[in-house]
């Protein structure tokens, strides 16, 4: 679980034609949470919902990508009821008490699992998403480079009635000639499973595209008996033990025509 600092902050950083923005503030007020839950057709939202937190990468011409909690929750699949109920029943069996069955078996994804990969920005100009076989060069990322800018933003977190954690956070680091972003959804249901959905975004200053890699990993706790339980709460450590269930590599290609006179950009609603 992340350590929460509730001091609001807003930071901007310029990387060539790009403006990187990280905004962090308090959790949403209960009235706003209820309104959003109705809009998303969900009976409840994560107990710590940072609806105004955002990490944005925007070109001077208006196109770009951002990461926010509301759009992430739009990608929660509330219709895979059988899978969720099966998981809830297994969780129920792992508990010594019996009063939790009604609590966890609900007609929505109470784990808030999301395959959100970001929200594309721009109106007339937009990043074009195309499949690719190219991968992010992890060796380049291991090179010791000066970190010009770093920020981490928590989007939501829920402790699943003290029986685990469901969280979504995004962090970015900027080097002299590139930037790298990691959006991570992490789910741990005590005694049942661990799931991790990662979106990595990488851009080198001399390229006309970003590389985006999405991986979904998951394992039942019963398959992790060889792993020290202390690692179950450490996403960076446990990830190597979680089998990959899905992997998607994409290029986010810049528009061919870049507006020489960037106008005020409008945020779109295209969620990836």
Swiss-Prot record:
Effect of residue 79 to H: Diminishes interaction with PPP2CA
InterPro entries: Phosphatase_reg/MetRdx, TIP41-like
Subunit structure: Isoform 1 interacts with PPP2CA. Isoform 2 does not interact with PPP2CA. Interacts with PPP2CB, PPP4C and PPP6C. Interacts with IGBP1; the interaction is dependent on PPP2CA. Associates with a protein phosphatase 2A PP2A(C):IGBP1 complex. Interacts with PPP4C and PPP4R2.
Coiled-coil parts of chain: none
Keywords recorded for this protein, A-Z: Acetylation, Cytoplasm, Phosphoprotein
Compartments reported by the entry: Cytoplasm
Protein's name according to its UniProt entry: TIP41-like protein
Pfam families in the record: TIP41
Protein family: Belongs to the TIP41 family.
